[in-house]
From Swiss-Prot:
Entries under Pfam families matching the protein: DinI
Function: Involved in SOS regulation. Inhibits RecA by preventing RecA to bind ssDNA. Can displace ssDNA from RecA. Inhibits NucA transcription.
Name of the protein in question: DNA damage-inducible protein I
Gene Ontology terms: biological process: DNA repair; SOS response
Organism: Serratia marcescens
Swiss-Prot/TrEMBL keywords: DNA damage, DNA repair, SOS response
Amino acid sequence: MRVEVTIDKTRPLPAGAIEALTGELGKRVNRQFPDAVVHVRYAGANGLSVLGGAKTDRDLIEEILQETWESADEWFSAE
């Protein structure tokens, strides 16, 4: 399974945030889907693509992404 998260490039994140999000989201997704590969990048709009998974897998990954984003204060430091 491949998971791709796109972040709107007109709303840049702090330095190191893309790498940190990739790592943290990857850890959380791999707990449920050990074969998943996670990519996070800038693009024209925010988005989520899940390739090679069922509809229920996408729903679960959306929940994981939401939890990861909301807990950013716990795992990301812009210093």
